[in-house]
Amino acid sequence: SCNPDIIGAVKVPDGSVDPFRLTAANVLDAKLHGAKVLVYCEVTELIKEAGAVVGVKLYNNVSKQYEEYYAPITLNAAGIWGQHIANLAGAKINMFPAKGSLLVFGHRVNNIVLNRCRKPADADILVPGDTICLIGTTSSRLPYDQIDDMKVTADEVDLLLREGEKLAPELAY
């Protein structure tokens, strides 16, 4: 499925991880080890005793209630939202969010990861996974106050399709 007009290639051992399965496996493992997994919740406050964080206060966006949870260890694993939680702890960090869009195709066109050998740019990797493949990603800076309001644009879809076809023309169909 590679573009027949490619004039050169380098074989590089590469692979991919299914992020959905990895996330599900991490959640299941955490639950097996006693974790309580919460979704649709926002940390609003860190609960401290003698200067140490002993829990969190959160807002549950489903029940519309505030809840408190206590634990011997509190871990900030909030990804891009981690800046807010770090600020609650008095740690000032500046994260620089970037929006990355990708396209997932309902069919697979390649059996190996295809990367472009160039400086990182939009749509420079085609990744197979089970019965699908994906092309991505775009990367554009985003103001921190807009991280909860991201949408894929038609221009991004067009760019991903156009650039993806250069790796595998079959993506045009």
Question: What positions do the PLM features span?
Answer:
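Helix-loop-beta segment of a Rossmann-like dinucleotide-binding subdomain
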Residues: 1-33, 55-57, 138-148
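Active-site substrate-recognition segment that forms the wall
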Residues: 68-69, 77-173
